[in-house]
């Protein structure tokens, strides 16, 4: 009989119960007992949902108070030694110190989980780290599920992936050298799970989809031989997010009882495993765990029916990956219309899709006729819908020419035209875009959205805020101003609500990290701009000052990356449609007299594919759609972009090919070390390295910012340097913002005084230098 299961389930709750319980506990408004009660209730509800849908196991081990990688580290005793915590006695409060930091300890580093929008806490490996024993939370949850009558399958992050995701610290030369010490801790966990009556452990090794160095792939055989000898439950090796076919021979050889493959992202990979090993279960990931569209059940059944005939009971069906990455339950959704809702499936609905496939496989198509027909009708409705397909948008995208993705002149020519228009001083000062959003601003936006505030009153309040922001910037002495973005709740949602082809849920929340949840927009159809989105705000702001005002837009790749994207056309095509909508906005801003336009791309690097062989294609189209959005303007209109990453080296050629006149980047926390890559690459255009960290309420001393600017001037010619904070200032308070910016302007004045003979890029004295630099 075919088995159905899920690799994981969202932990936050359909109404974000975990988020609110965590934040209440952190504020001291509730007790640890209250928090634990919420966790217990959520686990019970989620296990019951799996049972009620007909899954053969409930998955235990996917719940975490903050992050599953942190919880794995705690289980294995692999906590950073700098905290001095005893893993076996770890309290919830201590676990939150690891995750969030406190006055005595910086938090653990956090980074993206593969190519998703979830963030995990990075384990720290030091020479003095000793593994196991750790917390007993996992075993408590196993007993909790068993006591409720559930058949348990445990999900556990595998040892090689755990080490691969970690960072070496404290002089540790080789993370992999710790594997022999780590394996006994895993073996002990597996033995204890067997003693608790657990039959199967899903051991996640998503690192197997990556291009691993030989030493890392070679580590799998001995590691799993050790685990197989531990006398634990049967192991289901889980891979996801990409094909593992390049490691097919290795995976076939491992002493595990089953393997999970992502057949949504990489359906073709099954061929590399043919014939399927006779000693292994195949867990076929045929329901998309990362997107919200209904599964084409007819198509999925056509894929799994032959597998069922060949494998019989050795065929399991599952989502492609954990359902952590999709909202909990479509039944809780109130904002979407019935047609659009009918095209979607959240986590709870995806469990039902698995049950339909199981019924059709075991009892035949007729037994699942109604559900299959409903799926087919939804797929057909979406394919034929006029709200999805817009011929004029498709024709415009198809007509894009190479010259539409190129500025009219090279950077040195543009720099001269822009400087003639803008007359900027050496080391121009600016900010990244947003300014503090007070409770009054947020309240006005919310009242306007609910219809409680008339349009004219709302306009007056926003204009008053813009006028205040402009006046404050002028008083501080900034050189290029922004309007402050008071009208925007979110840099993607604001634009999505003004574009056709986008929809927004009321309750489509997913976990980003800890208690932070995001509600990604839904791109369901061809994207176009019915009318200008930002022009009137920027035009009004520019009317208040003689200084140049930057228009502020979110770039096409970021609009794509931070959304649930339609799956019926290539992502590149959707990105191009967004770029064309932004191109129209850019041209309208220019026509309104806006001389500088910033197109933010904080998610440009996040879109990188997991496999090295796919990276060049992505970078080519990602840079091209940016240029499409930016290239319809005159030479004297200055295009800015902003990015914030911890690593630039591998994408610098692509960033250069975006051909923005000015790029601002986040560098203060790295003490300007990130800027070194731009210097070594000889980045040809202008750069604004962030001189202070906006994520901290601390106001840096003038001397600190001056020292950072000095370091920057040693890497990038001072004529091409801008001065700015790391990121937008939306989440900060006005007193700290004004103090920090005042210090930033003073640090800039001091540096200008030491470079009195220099002038900003594009002025006649420096044109030759820039032409030479651009050709270097």
Curated annotation (Swiss-Prot):
Disordered, as annotated region: 755-776
EC number(s) given by UniProt: 2.1.1.14
Residues the entry annotates as binding L-methionine: 432-434, 485, 600
Protein name: 5-methyltetrahydropteroyltriglutamate--homocysteine methyltransferase
Family: Belongs to the vitamin-B12 independent methionine synthase family.
Lineage start: Bacteria, Pseudomonadati, Pseudomonadota, Betaproteobacteria, Burkholderiales
Organism, scientific name: Ralstonia nicotianae (strain ATCC BAA-1114 / GMI1000)
Pfam families documented for this protein: Meth_synt_1, Meth_synt_2
Keyword Glycoprotein set for record: no
Pathway(s) served: Amino-acid biosynthesis; L-methionine biosynthesis via de novo pathway; L-methionine from L-homocysteine (MetE route): step 1/1
Reaction equations catalysed: 5-methyltetrahydropteroyltri-L-glutamate + L-homocysteine = tetrahydropteroyltri-L-glutamate + L-methionine
Chain positions recorded as Zn(2+) binding sites: 642, 644, 666, 727
């Amino acid at each position: 009989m075919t088995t159905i299961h899920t690799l994981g389930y969202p932990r936050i709750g359909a109404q974000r119960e975990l988020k609110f319980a965590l934040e209440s506990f952190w504020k001291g408004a509730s007790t640890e007992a209250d928090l634990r009660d919420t966790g217990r209730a959520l686990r019970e509800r989620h296990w019951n949902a799996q049972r009620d849908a007909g899954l053969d196991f409930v998955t235990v081990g996917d719940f975490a108070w903050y992050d599953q990688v942190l919880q794995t580290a705690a289980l294995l005793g692999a906590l950073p030694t700098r905290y001095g915590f005893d893993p076996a006695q770890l309290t919830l409060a201590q676990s939150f110190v690891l995750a969030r930091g406190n006055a005595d300890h910086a938090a653990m580093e956090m980074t993206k989980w593969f190519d998703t929008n979830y963030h995990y806490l990075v384990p720290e490996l030091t020479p003095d780290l000793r593994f196991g024993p750790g917390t007993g939370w996992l075993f408590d949850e196993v007993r909790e599920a068993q006591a409720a009558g559930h058949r348990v399958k445990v999900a556990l992050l595998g040892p090689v992936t755990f080490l691969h995701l970690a960072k070496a610290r404290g002089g540790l030369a080789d993370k992999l050298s710790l594997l022999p010490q780590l394996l006994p801790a895993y073996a002990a966990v597996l033995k204890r799970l067997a003693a608790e009556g657990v039959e199967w452990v899903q051991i996640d090794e998503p690192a197997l989809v990556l291009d691993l160095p030989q030493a890392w792939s070679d580590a799998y055989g001995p590691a799993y031989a050790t685990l197989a000898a531990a006398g634990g439950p049967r192991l289901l090796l889980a891979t996801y997010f990409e094909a593992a076919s390049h490691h097919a021979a290795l995976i076939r050889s491992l002493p595990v009882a089953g393997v999970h493959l992502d057949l949504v992202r990489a359906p073709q990979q099954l061929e590399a495993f043919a014939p399927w090993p006779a000693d292994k279960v195949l867990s076929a990931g045929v329901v998309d765990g990362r997107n919200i569209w209904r599964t084409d059940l007819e198509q999925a059944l056509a894929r799994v029916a032959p597998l069922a005939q060949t494998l019989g009971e050795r065929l399991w069906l599952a989502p492609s990956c954990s359902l952590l990455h999709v909202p909990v339950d479509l039944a809780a959704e109130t904002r979407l219309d019935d047609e659009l809702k009918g095209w979607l499936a959240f986590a709870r609905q995806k469990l039902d899709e698995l049950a339909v496939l199981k019924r059709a496989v075991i009892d035949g198509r007729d037994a699942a006729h109604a559900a299959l027909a409903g799926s087919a009708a939804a797929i057909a409705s979406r394919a034929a819908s006029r709200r999805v397909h817009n011929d004029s948008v498709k024709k415009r995208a198809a007509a894009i020419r190479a010259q539409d993705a190129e500025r009219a002149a090279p950077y040195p020519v543009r720099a001269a035209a822009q400087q003639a228009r803008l007359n900027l001083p050496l080391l121009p000062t600016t900010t990244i875009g947003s300014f503090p959003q007070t409770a009054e601003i947020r309240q006005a936006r919310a009242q306007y959205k609910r219809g409680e505030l008339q349009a004219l009153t709302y306009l007056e309040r926003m204009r008053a805020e813009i006028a205040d922001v402009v006046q404050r910037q002028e008083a501080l002495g900034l050189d290029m101003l922004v309007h402050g973005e008071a009208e925007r709740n979110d840099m993607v949602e604001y634009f999505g609500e003004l574009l056709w082809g986008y929809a927004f849920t009321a309750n489509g929340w997913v976990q980003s990290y800890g208690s932070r949840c995001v509600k990604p927009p839904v791109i369901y159809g061809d994207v176009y701009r019915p009318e200008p989105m930002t022009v009137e705000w920027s035009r009004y702001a520019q009317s208040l000052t003689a200084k140049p005002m930057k228009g502020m837009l979110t770039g096409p790749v970021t609009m794509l990356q931070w959304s649930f994207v339609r799956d019926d056309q290539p992502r590149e095509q959707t990105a191009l449609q967004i770029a064309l909508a932004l191109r129209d906005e850019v041209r309208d801003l220019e026509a309104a007299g806006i001389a500088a336009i910033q197109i933010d791309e904080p998610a440009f690097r996040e879109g990188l594919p997991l496999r090295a062989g796919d990276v060049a294609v992505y970078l080519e189209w990602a840079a091209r759609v940016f240029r499409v959005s930016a290239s319809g303007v005159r030479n004297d209109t200055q295009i800015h972009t902003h990015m914030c990453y911890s690593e630039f080296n591998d994408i610098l050629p692509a960033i250069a090919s975006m051909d923005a006149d000015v790029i601002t980047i986040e560098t203060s926390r790295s003490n300007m070390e990130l800027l070194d890559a731009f210097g070594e690459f000889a980045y040809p255009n202008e750069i604004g390295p962030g001189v202070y960290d906006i994520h901290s309420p601390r106001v840096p001393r003038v001397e600190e910012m001056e020292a950072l600017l000095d370091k920057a001037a040693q890497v990038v010619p001072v004529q091409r340097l801008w001065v700015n904070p790391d990121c937008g200032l939306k989440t900060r308070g006005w007193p700290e913002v004004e103090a920090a910016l005042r210090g930033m302007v003073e640090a800039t004045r001091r540096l200008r005084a030491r470079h009195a003979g220099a002038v900003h890029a594009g002025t006649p004295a420096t044109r030759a230098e820039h032409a030479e630099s651009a050709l270097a």
